[in-house]
């Protein structure tokens, strides 16, 4: 989340690759959702898809709908000539096609709904993966076979994206398309399957070392990589996903991870709680508001404070109360691996693995 804010210059720091925060989130999301579904199937020999989708709706819909209403109101007041067009874009957002309208060139505008592109990919993943996983598990397909299939999908997506680059496809097509970004989600799914098997204790030190290498690799890319450079589109995005998966795997599999103190640091966890709303509202403030006459050169920081204030208000006054309804659609198994709870606050705006937000 913070990486995305920096990339959008709401936090005035210089990180060329801040946009990779979305990739980190995709991997983590695939890992957490798959882990939850696997635990439920192990405990009950079934997966309640109705409960899954009810919980997702209760988690995502309140802030999402309020944001879209605010976007329409601001558009009507600031740009009434664009209101009819904005209604159409909001309609695409409601059916989670924002990423495709940008990928296929239906409308490239960076309007208030543009930020929903990543949520659209996430929702498309929700629609396909849980039923498919339930079907595979019900048919007694071995974990190892599912893992191999996931690995092949990751490779296929990487090849597909590289082919598009070679053939001169537009960057928007490769960046926003579900078919070109799904590798990160499925790397997360693959990590969840791997995490079902406990590694020998003697491998923990190696795992920590590999996690450290992954952190170094990610920090380097986030600091230096170019959005328009060929590296990301010719395998780089997949390497980012694999490094993120390795980091998540190492933290999840080690009870004494060197990252644990950082990931359990309360300010990070608090930002994790409000990160979904913050991800939405920062974009609306960035595109449609200015505090320059009040804050001067501190305009970006003023927007950041305003975004955090709105996001926190949304979470505590609306989302948290509606989240209480989730108990009616509870999982019949423990929520998630304890160590995985540490991972979210740094990157994930949409999936909250805490007791309250799963």
Label each region the model flagged.
Residues 2-40, 44-114, 121-332, 336:
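Hydrophobic membrane-embedded alpha-helices
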Residues 328-358:
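Short, intrinsically disordered terminal tails adjacent to the first/last structured region
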């Amino acid at each position: 989340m913070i990486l995305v804010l920096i990339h959008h210059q709401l936090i005035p720091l210089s990180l060329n690759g801040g946009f990779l925060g979305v990739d980190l989130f995709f991997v983590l999301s695939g890992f957490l959702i798959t882990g939850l579904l696997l635990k439920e199937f192990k405990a009950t020999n079934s997966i309640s898809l109705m409960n899954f989708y009810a919980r997702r709706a209760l988690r995502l819909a309140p802030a999402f709908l309020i944001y879209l209403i605010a976007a329409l109101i601001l558009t009507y007041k600031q740009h009434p000539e664009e209101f009819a067009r904005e209604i159409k874009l909001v309609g695409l957002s409601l059916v989670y096609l924002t990423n495709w309208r940008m990928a296929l060139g239906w409308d490239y505008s960076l309007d208030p709904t543009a930020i929903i592109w990543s949520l659209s990919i996430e929702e498309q993943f929700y629609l396909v993966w849980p039923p498919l996983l339930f079907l595979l598990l019900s048919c007694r397909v071995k974990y190892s076979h599912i893992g191999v299939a996931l690995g092949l999908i990751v490779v296929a997506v990487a090849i597909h994206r590289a082919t598009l680059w070679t053939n001169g496809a537009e960057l928007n097509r490769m960046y926003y398309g579900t078919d070109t970004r799904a590798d990160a989600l499925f790397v997360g799914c693959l990590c969840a399957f791997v995490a079902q098997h406990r590694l020998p204790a003697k491998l923990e030190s190696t795992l920590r070392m590999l996690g450290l290498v992954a952190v170094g690799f990610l920090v380097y890319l986030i600091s230096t990589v170019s959005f328009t450079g060929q590296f990301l589109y010719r395998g780089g995005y997949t390497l980012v996903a694999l490094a993120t998966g390795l980091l998540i795997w190492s933290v999840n599999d080690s009870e004494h991870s060197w990252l644990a103190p950082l990931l359990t640091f309360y300010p990070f966890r608090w930002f994790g709680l409000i990160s979904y709303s913050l991800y939405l509202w920062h974009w609306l403030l960035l595109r449609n508001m200015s505090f320059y006459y009040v804050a001067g050169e501190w305009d970006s920081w003023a927007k950041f404070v305003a975004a955090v204030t709105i996001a926190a208000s949304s979470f505590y006054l609306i989302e948290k109360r509606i989240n209480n309804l989730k108990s009616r659609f509870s999982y019949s198994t423990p929520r998630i691996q304890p160590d995985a709870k540490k991972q979210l606050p740094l990157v994930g705006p949409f999936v909250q693995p805490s007791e309250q937000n799963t």
